[in-house]
């Protein structure tokens, strides 16, 4: 049958799937209640997606750091996702008109809008399947809020630290975040990429948008910017993935636990981009190797790639192909690990679940999905450690940030590097 790929919104031919809508539709209530009771205590979450800042009021009315400057902003940058069904159309339009992630050439704007309009109803159906919207904003707010509480204790010299969200394709958008920074009297801002592994199509696209909006608003010199541009080997991140895998392994009978194959699944990338030297592929490999080292290589593992779009070659092997081929060889027990994501969203809650249902229909009954790091305090502590090191090092970005891909011909890439070199 023809299935609509939920993550990249393209049609692809697959085997039939079972109806698991009700299970995913209960995701929000079940997951969030477990989080509040069992993992950590957090303040109540407001679903108002237009609010860009999370718990932004400085403690005890403080509006300046001990250095006499304004608060330090930590801006959580990500693709984002529609928080409700009404946001799906605008989300798709922003996505398909962005040449950094989906290049359509001369007809980028008109063709992108056309594609978005045609696909909106189908994509809305997929978001309905997971509860009516993406949980990515919810988890990003929790991560940012808890991280900044830790930063206030670790780095009193730059406190208070205020968490903000800047999504590329869904509210809260980059331009709204900049207005909120101004209102909060921010002096220094850290652009914290929520893509642990760098790709020009993800981290690069978000920073390109930040540059554009700073110029459009005439805010180039309003804030002192620095960038956490990649963190594939951050120990808190590695430990959080490992802990989630260990918890899932415990759900298997003890006598088969060591035989479970761990499948690290990341969003795929066109081979044309890989051939240019985009570092994403080897940074994904670095993360998965580090996780397996933390697990003492007790299980076999495979790197796989999901969400391919169109007929051109993309990174392989595809995640669903890996599941099927291993299953054909008698391997029934596998754990799918979304290794490139810091929170659950449509690609984990819908696409990976579809793969699991496909596998069950083929008799591959032991495939399970590991949750993203979401509200893991291990990961959040790691984020705080990372940003604290960044603040104390007083460097604008990593050494690798100014290294363009050997085959890069993108003007926006060169403009991004030149722009942030001035800070």
Curated annotation (Swiss-Prot):
Pathway: Porphyrin-containing compound metabolism; protoheme biosynthesis; protoheme from protoporphyrin-IX: step 1/1. The active site is at 385. One of its GO terms (cellular component) is cytosol. The keyword Transferase does not apply. PROSITE patterns: FERROCHELATASE (PS00534). InterPro entries: Ferrochelatase, Ferrochelatase_AS, Ferrochelatase_C, Ferrochelatase_N. It is an enzyme of class 4 (lyase). Binds 1 [2Fe-2S] cluster. Its cofactor is [2Fe-2S] cluster. It comes from the Eukaryota. Belongs to the ferrochelatase family. This is Ferrochelatase, mitochondrial.
